Amino acid sequence: MSFSISLSFPDGSQRDFPAEITGLELAESISKSLAKKAIAYSLNGVIRDLLDPLEQSGQVEIITRDDPRALQLIRHSCAHVLAEAVQELFPETQVTIGPVIENGFYYDFARQQPFTLEDLNTIEKKMREIIQRNKFFKKEIWSREKAKKIFSDKGELYKVELIDAIPEDQDLKIYYQGDWFDLCRGPHVPSTGQIGNAFKLMKVAGAYWRGDANNPMLTRIYGTAFSNENALKAYLNMLEEAEKRDHRRLGREMDLFHFQEEGPGMIFWHPKGWKMFQNLVSYMRRRLDEHKYDEVNAPQVLDKSLWETSGHWGWYQENMFKTIPATNDWNDEHVYALKPMNCPGHVQIFKHGLKSYRDLPIRLAEFGLLHRYEPSGSLHGLMRVRSFTQDDAHVFCTDEQLADECLKINDLILSTYADFGFEEIILKLSTRPEKRVGSDELWDHAENIMMSVLKTIEKEAKGRIKTSILQGEGAFYGPKFEYTLKDAIGREWQCGTTQVDFNLPERFEVFYINRDSEKCQPVMIHRAIFGSMERFLGILIENFAGHMPLWLAPQQIVVTTITSEANEYAEKITAKLKASGLSAVSDLRSEKINYKIREHSLQKVPVILVCGKRESETNSVNMRRLGSMNQISLPIDQAIKQLTNEAIPPDLRRFMNS
């Protein structure tokens, strides 16, 4: 057999192998122990079934169970076992789709009677039985006609619809596990036994076919799977902790906000919640001023002609809230929409008046109230809403200023996250997608600048930031940075973005006058730090489990009395606290002190000052911190000084110490 392909390995070595060698044969040629551990291989970055032949030269890696990439294979294969288990137990059920998602997988089923939570235990037991059979995953390529006939004969009409949607030039792959089979792109682990037992079915939910409310309602079963029992246990423990921190529950207990049916995805902010929101806005306003941004405000409602120019009307219209004057109809040219994004408005502000290169960079920021029509099933407290405020900014600069502006934005983003206690940051650079605007030369230039910025950030971060490059994941209008932070229980939240835009300046014919007195198109940078202010507040509530830092807390201090004899003294203390700039209220109710302390603790008030007859006579207070059983007796002036210092926001503290 001739040696016709050359393979490069992670250790830098390179060897020739016979064409059509399988991944398993390749692993066996390296070592028997590796072959036993192997579950798939990667060729030039594409993960493939272990028994697939290698038809071309390139970079190759054998993937074992411990490889992070193995998790997707395990979960994908587990979804297939779930579908087989359901059809063994409930033969009348049609299977539809079963993708891998973040932290697990799901499968959608069509049946007259939806599954119940009680059914999950039965299904999970059957799954373990199927895994124990250790049947091989076997791939076949079928013709379109054969696939449609077989699935039609089985009554799997959703599969027939999926087959019709697959492009003619793509193979139809069918994966068998024993006698059961499914339409699937793959890849999978070699056999059901290699899924292991570290999996669990989590919940049942309803889902419309293809996410369209006009289609039939299906029953979705969610599950998760890991490479080992310890990882599964850690994940389930994290979920248990996350439930305790759920911002929706804490929002009720702390009396921050609520939702109701008349305004789905729209937040009703209560006084305490709105105070916390405004504290966040005030913090960011100071940071914007520090970094030389100009705050602006653009209209909420704009004519569709503007959205047509920006491109939103063509590709985002279904997510926009539209309106017309009472005298008009939908066919009239004067159709309006609530803005889903701030950028077109900021472009109009930049265009108003002639700009010179001497004026650049111009940094326009807005706490813009946006409206986006999200599907009702996707709404989730503050994390996914239909009306939200974005801490949006757009920087208009010259090409020469791009790198420096990206670095300045990075400094602002990282220092902001640090102020809220987020020290573990993941930064991803997303490069050109297949469908994009702009020439290759333009993309080459922008990506080279962003790559240079990334290297500078890595050097200055000194290990604080993990970085990666996502090939082909950029926006159609330019490359972008995405900032992801880790919270107190290890969850990742994508928040900040820095995006270069070639599209809008060209669409709106934006220009400035350069040194040669010629019109020149500026570089436009989209930038957000919190992203959605509401979502970031939800993240903070969960990260701190409601124990907000004193400077951010909506109600910082409660002064409560033991007896009515101390009422006048308590009100005097409250007035002094307010005069010092602190948020304080008096609780003079004739309730037992332990009852009042418990109530305020449930509402997550950071500091409770207890006053009785002795405190009023000694001009002191008993200070109790949230989460602590200890009380400290302090003179009132000392307590106020201590709390006033503690309540200084981190950005102001930096300024005072500089």
Curated annotation (Swiss-Prot):
GO terms for biological process: threonyl-tRNA aminoacylation. The keyword Metal-binding applies. It is found in: Cytoplasm. SUPFAM superfamilies: Class II aaRS ABD-related, Class II aaRS and biotin synthetases, TGS-like, ThrRS/AlaRS common domain. It catalyses: tRNA(Thr) + L-threonine + ATP = L-threonyl-tRNA(Thr) + AMP + diphosphate + H(+). It comes from the Bacteria. Its main location: cytoplasm. Residues 246-549 are annotated as: Catalytic. Keywords: Aminoacyl-tRNA synthetase, ATP-binding, Cytoplasm, Ligase, Metal-binding, Nucleotide-binding, Protein biosynthesis, RNA-binding, tRNA-binding, Zinc. HAMAP family: Thr_tRNA_synth (MF_00184). This is Threonine--tRNA ligase. It comes from Bartonella bacilliformis (strain ATCC 35685 / KC583 / Herrer 020/F12,63).
